[in-house]
Regions:
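Surface-exposed patches in mature extracellular/periplasmic domains of secreted proteins
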Residues: 111-118, 156-158, 207-216, 272-279
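Catalytic-core regions of hydrolytic enzymes
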Residues: 51-194
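Active-site-adjacent mobile loop/cap segments within catalytic or ligand-binding domains
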Residues: 163-164, 211-286
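Active-site-adjacent substrate-binding region
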Residues: 188-217
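N-terminal, intrinsically disordered, polar/charged segments of Gram-positive cell-envelope systems
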Residues: 20-71, 277-286
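Hydrophobic membrane-insertion alpha-helices, especially the h-region
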Residues: 2-19
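Active-site-adjacent loop/helix surface patches within enzyme catalytic domains
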Residues: 144-163, 204-205, 209, 218-228
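Sec-exported extracytoplasmic/periplasmic mature domains
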Residues: 100-111, 147-151, 159, 200-208, ...
Length: 286
């Protein structure tokens, strides 16, 4: 009798368990889903925690905030042709060609490049105002781009002309002269001078045209007024010199100039080649 009672009790327990299992499948599966879900959630948390370590990095290993910002300004453009040769070669066109070559050189390094223009246009509002007012606006907008908060260096590309003496030739680099009044820009001017001297040296070494020049400080250039960031202006040659004008029109010579300018810049930055780059056209900055 005791054995029969025990068996009966066991059968009853088994029957109750089967009923519980039948009416509560979600409870059992839910336990499994909770465990699996916990693993999945943990995996997601792991990926998300790792993401911030990689999200800001480029293949060059530098975070965006660490990359130097270089503004390349092709002088003149649009209605403003700049200087011209006796044969009608326009400064604005050669400025742009050299600037684009310089952009390509910089693109081989971990920098952010901002171009003030990438085609034949000015940075002014095309309205009925006098030309002088448009030119003033154009220069002011260029200065604003070159004085951006994160800018490391601004490089303005130009050409010279001196019709009174067609024998004058050679590239010349200018940098801001420290103002005697107003904002104290001594440190910025010192940094600008360092870049300018490095570029001037590279131009002489790479071009080897027999012309020796020293980087010069200037205070009468609007771009240099109350300068807040290092800036240089490179006069790449004289359109008034017939021989140099022919060279300046040549793509190979334009590339030579751009290489020399960038090598001078990179002597200061000391960046390794073959890294990432972001190129920004001023027209698409919003």
């Amino acid at each position: 009798m005791l054995l029969l009672a025990a068996v009966s009790a066991a059968v009853g327990l088994l029957f109750r368990f089967m009923i519980w299992a039948a009416v509560s499948p979600v409870s059992m599966v839910g336990a499994g889903e909770s465990a699996a879900g916990g693993q999945a959630e943990a995996a997601v948390r792991t990926e998300r925690s790792a993401a911030p370590q990689e999200a800001g990095l480029r293949e060059d290993g530098l975070q965006p905030a660490q990359r130097p910002v270089i503004v390349i300004d092709a002088g003149h453009g649009g209605m403003d042709g700049g200087a011209s040769s006796a044969e009608g070669v326009r400064e604005k066109d050669i400025n742009l060609a050299i600037a684009r070559c310089l952009e390509a050189e910089a693109a081989q390094y971990p920098v952010e490049v901002i171009m003030t223009r990438t085609d034949d246009r000015g940075l002014y509002t095309d309205d009925a105002r006098p030309i002088r007012a448009k030119k003033r606006e154009d220069l002011q907008r260029r200065k604003e781009l070159m004085e951006g908060e994160t800018v490391t260096l601004g490089i303005s590309i130009h050409l010279n002309s001196f019709p009174q003496d067609a024998s004058v030739y050679g590239a010349q680099v200018f940098y801001p002269k420290e103002a005697r009044t107003g904002t104290d820009v001594s440190q910025v001017c010192a940094q600008s001078k360092r870049y300018a001297e490095s570029i001037q040296k590279r131009l002489e070494t790479n071009i080897s045209d027999g012309r020796e020049r020293s980087a010069m400080a200037k205070s009468d250039i609007l771009l240099f007024a109350q300068v807040q960031h290092p800036m240089v202006l490179v006069e790449c040659g004289f359109l008034s010199n017939p021989d140099e004008c022919v060279r300046l029109e040549t793509p190979a010579y334009q590339q030579l100039l751009a290489c020399a300018i960038w090598e001078g810049v990179n002597e200061i930055l000391c960046l390794e080649k073959n890294k990432s780059v972001t190129v920004i056209d001023s027209a698409n900055r919003g």
